[in-house]
Design a protein with these regions (language model features):
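Signature of the SF2 helicase/ATPase Hel1-core->accessory helical subdomain module
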Residues: 1, 124-193
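Coupling/switch/interface segments within P-loop NTPase motor domains and analogous charged loops
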Residues: 2-151
């Protein structure tokens, strides 16, 4: 779901076929996602928030053991150059609203927390040597950024028909109030109204 800005450029076709899996497409906060998702976030955030290059690489590297391979992934991430402008713009609107909500609640906002992570990850460390507190904070923020991106993509998708192949694999999403369940129900019950 979070890769839609790089996969579909403009939803101007009569039919868009997008495949989702219950474990990876909807469960966003429990993990940092796959490399391509983080490379997409890198390109989105670096441009939109004017982030420092190397620290942002370090924050989003997560469990990729080889630093050079991760940096090559970012450098060679072709979709990062031609993202759907409407989704990108909508993502930063959603982020701004989320930041305003956090500030209203008296919480440190996600942008400030990400910049703080960039400071804390300003130099490269092997994953095994990163203190657990840094990993926990990083994973939480990446999960939040992915969740906001997923909601943004869901709104852009505007599905008229959702077909569940192997629907029994989605059953757990229909009857729970987790973030993944709420996101799935939002997709399944989308209305043009």
């Amino acid at each position: 779901l979070t890769l839609l800005p790089s996969i579909i450029n403009g939803f101007d076709r009569k039919l868009n076929f997008v495949s989702f899996t219950p474990g990876t497409s909807f469960d966003l906060k429990s993990s940092t996602g796959i490399q391509q998702e983080r490379a997409l976030l890198f390109h989105l955030l670096k441009k939109g928030w004017d982030l420092p290059h190397i620290p942002t690489c370090n924050v989003l590297q997560c469990d990729v053991a080889d630093k050079d391979r991760w940096r090559a992934t970012i450098k060679n991430y072709e979709p990062g150059l031609k993202l759907d402008k409407n989704i990108v713009d909508a993502y930063f609107v959603e982020l701004s609203q989320y930041i305003a909500w956090e500030k209203q609640k008296g919480l440190p906002d996600i942008r400030s927390r990400f910049f703080d992570l960039c400071t804390r990850f300003s130099y490269y460390q092997q994953h095994k040597n990163i203190p657990w507190e840094k990993i926990r904070d990083r994973n939480k923020i990446i999960g939040e950024l992915r969740a906001i991106l997923a909601r943004t993509c869901l709104k852009a998708l505007e599905p008229d028909l959702v077909i569940l192949d192997e629907f029994q694999r989605f059953k757990h999403l229909l009857n729970n109030d987790s973030d993944a369940g709420l996101l799935a129900r939002e997709l399944f019950s989308y209305s043009d109204e």
